[in-house]
Structure formats: structure tokens, C-alpha cells
């Protein structure tokens, strides 16, 4: 019973860390990264579809993304979707592929991106803390229902706290790495 509660809390915390990694991957850091376009949805026969499901997205150079659609007819739609996105990127097409040159980030934009990254990291820290709170509530309920002794619950709560601290540290490391990547000129 207690082990299940601990395992469930840890799984939620793992999901929060993975979610943060995905979120931060989509933040532009001055380098071309195919993950930038993961959230760009293209209207493909009336259905919003991610770019990476319609084309091969590659990064042959540090500041260049190349999108090679499997269906050439969708090329203009992909261009429109990229222009509409909040990425601030301008695609150029030659009829077969779309090239996106990633411009250098200004110092002001870098600091804005760092703020966004910190905000996202805090959101995911809150998720980890919520998982801790839920686990502690379940542990207290199991103590109240006489399913576990007070000592067992205390030990389990300490484990939950250690796990929480561990995942918060992981989030902080991920954030520090992303901040360094963003501030890199």
C-alpha cells in the first residue's frame, strides 16, 4: 500500500521532469533544433497536424532548419503555419524544401527567454510538489484508516520528501542547462 503510493508519486514527478524537458526543447535558444517546430500545427486536409508528421525536419547547420515535406502540395500550408506561429521565424521555400534560418538572438530576447524558461520550470516544480502533497495526503489517510502505523507513514513521508527534493534538483539542473544554452552567444 505505502509502496504503491510512493511509486505513484515518483511516476508523477518523472512525468513532470519529462514534460519540462519537452517544453524547454521547444524554446528557441539561437540554435536550430527540430524540436522548435513540434508545436507548429499545419492544416492538413482540415486536420491540425504537427509538422514533424508531415515532413522530415532536420538541422544540417547550427542556424538552419530544413523541412522536406513528404507531400509537396502541403508546402504552402507548412509555410503559413510557421509564419502564424509565435516563433518569429521566416521560412523560405524553393518548391521542394523549406529552409528556415535561425537569426541571432538579441540580449533582450535572451533575457525574455530565460524568464520564460524559469516560469516553465516553476510550473513543473509545482507539479512535483503537488505530487508530494497528494502522496502525503494518501499516507495520512492510510494512517487514519489504520492501514499503516504512524512510524511507517513517517518513514514513507520522509522518502516522499527525499524524492521530491531529488526531482526539484533535476528540474533546477535542466533549467540551468537551458539558461546557459539561451545566454550562449
Swiss-Prot record:
Signal peptide: none annotated. Keywords: Cytoplasm, Protein biosynthesis. InterPro entries: Ribosome_recyc_fac, Ribosome_recyc_fac_dom, RRF_sf. It is found in: Cytoplasm. One of its GO terms (cellular component) is cytoplasm. GO terms for molecular function: ribosomal large subunit binding. The keyword Oxidoreductase does not apply. The keyword Cytoplasm applies. Its main location: cytoplasm. One of its GO terms (biological process) is translational termination. Gene3D superfamilies: 3.30.1360.40, Ribosome-recycling factor. It comes from the Bacteria. Responsible for the release of ribosomes from messenger RNA at the termination of protein biosynthesis. May increase the efficiency of translation by recycling ribosomes from one round of translation to another. PANTHER family: MITOCHONDRIAL RIBOSOME RECYCLING FACTOR PSEUDO 1 (PTHR20982:SF3), RIBOSOME RECYCLING FACTOR (PTHR20982). Belongs to the RRF family. NCBIfam families: frr. This is Ribosome-recycling factor. It comes from Moorella thermoacetica (strain ATCC 39073 / JCM 9320). The gene is frr.
Amino acid at each position: 500500500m505505502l509502496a504503491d503510493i510512493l511509486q505513484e508519486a515518483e511516476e508523477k514527478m518523472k512525468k513532470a521532469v519529462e514534460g519540462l524537458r519537452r517544453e524547454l526543447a521547444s524554446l528557441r535558444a539561437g540554435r536550430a533544433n527540430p524540436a522548435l517546430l513540434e508545436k507548429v500545427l499545419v492544416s492538413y486536409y482540415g486536420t491540425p497536424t504537427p509538422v514533424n508528421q508531415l515532413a522530415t525536419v532536420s538541422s544540417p547547420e547550427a542556424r538552419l532548419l530544413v523541412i522536406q515535406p513528404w507531400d509537396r502540395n502541403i508546402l504552402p500550408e507548412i509555410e503559413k503555419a510557421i509564419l502564424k506561429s509565435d516563433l518569429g521565424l521566416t521560412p523560405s521555400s524553393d518548391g521542394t524544401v523549406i529552409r528556415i534560418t535561425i537569426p541571432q538572438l538579441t540580449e533582450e530576447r535572451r533575457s525574455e527567454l530565460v524568464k520564460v524558461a524559469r516560469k516553465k520550470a516553476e510550473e513543473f516544480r509545482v507539479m512535483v510538489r503537488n505530487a508530494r502533497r497528494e502522496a502525503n495526503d494518501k499516507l495520512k489517510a492510510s494512517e487514519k484508516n489504520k492501514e499503516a502505523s504512524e512510524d511507517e507513514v513517517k518513514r514513507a513521508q520522509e522518502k516522499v520528501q527525499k524524492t521530491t527534493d531529488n526531482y526539484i534538483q533535476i528540474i533546477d539542473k535542466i533549467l540551468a542547462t537551458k539558461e546557459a544554452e539561451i545566454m550562449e552567444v
